[in-house]
Amino acid sequence: MRTTIARRHLLRSAGALGLALAGPRLALAEAKTLVAATFPGTWSEADRNVILPAFKQKTGAVATQSIILGGDQVSRLAAAKGNQPPFDVAFFDSPQVIDAVRDGLIVEYPVAKSPNFKELLPSAQDKWGPKITMQVIGIGYNPNKITTPPMSWDDLLDPKYKGRVGLTALNSQLGIAFLVEVNRLKGGTDDNFDPAFKFLAQLLPNVGAIAANLGAYATLWQQEQVDIAPYNFNFVQTLKAKDVPVELSIPSSGAVGWSTSLHLVTNAAEPELAVQYIDLHLDASIQDQLMKPPYDAIPTNAHVKLEGAITKSLVKSQDDLAKIRTIDWEKINPQRSALIDRFNREIKT
């Protein structure tokens, strides 16, 4: 625990020293450093290139990134509970929010101190923290090999795709969301996943590879080892930017996804700065920037006009975003370990 606190103290001291060198008056006024969690990949790049400079310009304070996945954030916050947390702002997907609230790791978001909060879509205004974007899954496919966009999850079963279908393990939101959606379409419930596993068993002859994680999954696409597979919008856009031949098709059964949100951590060292940092992510001009390549983040501010890849692949308007089907993570989270074990036992092996 002392190591975590010492490291954080060093980050803050370094920030204060840099400001002191810049000028005594500035150092006295703003010798503060915020520590904010962010996801690896596109989001860490977006925060580094867009958010951090804007935050410094607006507040005069320095923000540093802690690049870490949501589940690991929960673990670190839990380990530090009762002491100074390792970061002030948490960056979660929907499943981690439930765990963080249950364990008292985040506090209710102070809406009155966040002027941009009221501009969010109603579905993005959560009392535990604003939803800053969405992740939407569909069918990824190689347009050089598949000229007609697939419109049904059942298309994955087509014998012509033998050995060319990809899957990812259930340790990712993508894997779980795919399982839940297929289960729903096949008549299952959140208490009965037999239909989903029956579908996966039927799919096995077509499966060419099952990636252990999302990084390995991206490699399958980059090396063109798969032609068709469940994927999400943001990852497809990231690969397309690298000239990987991949497109996303939303099945006729509709889009399904989850939210990504920001949260004020319990006992945050810099709560006021944390709220300003979070509120900056809600600003319409910031979300407009993040909607464009190379970030392609789906905006949640109602004043941002949708355009580009989002309108081509996903939805045409903000009203359509509200129609994206979500997952009942309250029911799924307690089963997640059992579902992963069953997948590893029946499918992955």
Range-by-range predicted roles:
Residues Q135, K198-L203, K240-T266, A302:
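Periplasmic-binding protein-like
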Residues E30-I98:
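Early extracytoplasmic/lumenal segment of secretory-pathway proteins
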Residues G41-R48, P86-Q225:
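Extracytoplasmic ligand-binding site segments that recognize negatively charged/polar headgroups
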Residues V97-D99, Q222, D227-P245:
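A ligand-binding cleft/hinge motif common to bilobed small-molecule-binding domains
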Residues V265-I324:
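Mature extracytoplasmic/periplasmic domains
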Residues M1-G18:
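N-terminal secretory signal peptides and thylakoid transit peptides that target proteins
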Residues G138-K145, E181-R184, S259-P271, I278, ...:
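A bilobed periplasmic-binding-protein/Venus flytrap-type ligand-binding module shared by bacterial periplasmic
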Residues D320-T349:
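Conserved C-terminal helix/tail region of periplasmic/extracytoplasmic solute-binding proteins
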